[in-house]
């Protein structure tokens, strides 16, 4: 499976964070990152998504936020998407998003995180903490309140970021006021657990083992099995568990 992905990616020369990509292309790349993003990253594949912030219009350059968001509010809300999704997933078919509603009704400025969901949740959590510190420091006006909204895996990444942020004394925790999680598997994902049990059962059946695509799940997907948040969680269980 991963060799096939490598071959296919050679036919797609552009970078994962190319600002000229359509939402459909971005969705496809995000799905591939969710399935085997750890492999894309370890092999230096150009389609491995680097963590970044964006608006609905473009990826944010932290050195030019004032120009990109001239009406930035002191009340910042960051949206963190789930497995195999992208910042585009917060706005379905051009409909109004939650971010639009919060901007108009609460005077908040929405920012959307893009990241490789095939990586370990703890790795993304640690990186998110660092990125939030940089975002708050670069914000055009002093941040009075920070809100984080996570969907599915995004909620686990936020919780992981909070843990690592507290351990490091990260400055973004000072303005943090609220965290909202939507459909987050805090106690593990039942579907991923079922898939793991099915794989283990089928491994005992002759000739079936080579066909088990579940064996190729990314480490990000595997972390969902037990709701792993920290390095210690997946290290104790073992990479292959």
Predicted regions and their residues:
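Alpha/beta-hydrolase active-site loop
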Residues: 119-139, 156
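Catalytic metal-binding/acid-base residues of hydrolase active sites
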Residues: 116, 154, 185
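Flexible, membrane-associating and regulatory peripheral segments of lipid-active enzymes
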Residues: 1-113, 123, 137-141, 191-200
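A generic structural signal for alpha->beta connector loops
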Residues: 107, 145, 173-176
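Catalytic nucleophile serine of serine hydrolases
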Residues: 82, 152, 183
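Gly/Ala-rich beta-loop-alpha elbow adjacent to hydrolase catalytic centers
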Residues: 149-158
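Structural motif
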Residues: 74-77, 145-147, 178
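Helical cap/lid subdomain of alpha/beta-hydrolase-fold lipid enzymes
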Residues: 19-33, 37, 163-241
């Amino acid at each position: 499976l991963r060799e096939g992905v490598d071959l296919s990616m050679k036919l797609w020369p552009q970078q994962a964070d190319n600002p000229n990509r359509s939402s459909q292309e971005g969705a496809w790349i995000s799905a591939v990152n969710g399935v085997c993003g750890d492999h894309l990253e370890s092999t230096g594949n150009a389609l491995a998504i680097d963590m970044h912030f964006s608006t609905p219009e473009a990826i944010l350059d932290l050195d030019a936020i004032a120009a990109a968001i001239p009406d930035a509010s002191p009340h910042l809300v960051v949206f963190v998407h789930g497995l195999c999704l992208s910042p585009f997933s917060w706005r379905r078919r051009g409909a109004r998003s939650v971010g639009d509603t919060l901007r108009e009704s609460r005077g908040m400025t929405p920012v959307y995180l893009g990241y490789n969901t095939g990586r370990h949740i703890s790795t993304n959590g640690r990186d998110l903490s660092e990125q939030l510190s940089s975002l708050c420091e670069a914000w055009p006006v002093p941040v009075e309140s920070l809100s984080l909204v996570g969907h599915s895996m995004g909620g686990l990444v936020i919780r992981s970021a909070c843990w690592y942020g507290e351990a490091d004394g990260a400055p973004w925790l000072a303005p943090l006021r609220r965290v909202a999680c939507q459909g987050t598997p805090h106690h593990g994902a039942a579907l991923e657990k079922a898939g793991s049990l099915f794989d283990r059962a089928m491994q005992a059946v002759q000739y079936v083992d080579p066909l088990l695509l579940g064996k190729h799940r990314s480490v990000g997907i595997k972390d969902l099995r037990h709701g792993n948040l920290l390095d210690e969680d997946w290290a104790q269980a073992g990479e292959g568990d």
